[in-house]
């Protein structure tokens, strides 16, 4: 189930209950609605953590890049609600970078977990190069960017996937919300507004 402890009995996309049993049989749950079960370990990141920690829920890393560096294909990196300024590279890994909104069933965490420009301004989130093609970013917001090109998200020569993201309140002469160059990025259930 998506999150049984809080009463979310929708099935995950790769649940063994899908297409099983006899048609017409009620099993007491809803259709698929929340994505696949994460197959790899889950790494946590919190700005109050430390990169010498093990990346667990109680002992998170301080930086996203540290979590990426220790991850392998299929892993998930979960960000605690906070503002993130970090430049990252996914190093050709097929990983998911997400907020804890799905884990805890609190959709507001998408707004509370966001990338913003650093103290000197600029874009909120930049990915450059094909080493970022296999990444999935979901349940995160990008806001407050002020720059010439790509206030919110800048994707250059890479094509990652964005799911359930909010890109808002960014300013740029070109691509206020999103600036793509050499990219075939995929955006699903994305809100792009007030840019």
Language-model features: where?
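Bulky hydrophobic/aromatic "packing anchor" residues in well-ordered structure
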Residues: 1, 11, 17-19, 45, ...
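C-terminal accessory segments
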Residues: 1-35, 122, 129
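Right-handed parallel beta-helix/beta-solenoid
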Residues: 1-6, 34-66, 70
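Glycine-rich beta-solenoid repeat tracts in large extracellular/virion proteins
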Residues: 3, 87-90, 123-130, 151-157, ...
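N-terminal extracellular ligand-recognition/capping segment immediately after the signal peptide
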Residues: 7, 73-96, 100-105
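Hydrophobic strand positions within the blades of repeat-based beta-sheet folds
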Residues: 19, 153, 162-165, 178, ...
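Right-handed parallel beta-helix/beta-spiral solenoid domain characteristic of secreted/periplasmic
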Residues: 94-146
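Right-handed parallel beta-helix
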Residues: 98-99, 111-112, 133-144, 159-171, ...
């Amino acid at each position: 189930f998506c999150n049984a402890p809080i009463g979310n009995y929708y099935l995950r996309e790769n649940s063994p209950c899908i297409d099983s049993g006899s048609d017409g049989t009620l099993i007491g749950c809803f259709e698929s609605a929340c994505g696949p079960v994460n197959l790899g370990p889950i790494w946590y990141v919190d700005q109050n953590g430390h990169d010498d920690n093990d990346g667990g829920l109680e002992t998170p890393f301080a930086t996203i890049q540290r979590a990426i560096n220790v991850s392998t294909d299929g892993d998930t990196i979960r960000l605690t609600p906070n503002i993130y300024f970090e430049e990252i590279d996914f190093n050709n890994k097929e990983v998911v970078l997400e907020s804890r909104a799905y884990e805890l069933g609190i959709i507001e965490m998408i707004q509370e977990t966001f990338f913003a420009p650093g103290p000197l301004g600029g874009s909120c989130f930049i990915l450059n190069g094909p080493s970022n093609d296999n990444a999935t970013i979901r349940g995160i917001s990008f806001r407050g960017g002020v720059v010439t090109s790509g206030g919110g998200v800048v994707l250059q020569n890479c094509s990652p996937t964005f799911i359930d993201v909010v890109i808002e309140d960014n300013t740029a002469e070109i691509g206020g919300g999103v600036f793509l160059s050499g990219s075939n990025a995929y955006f699903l259930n994305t809100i792009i507004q007030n840019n």
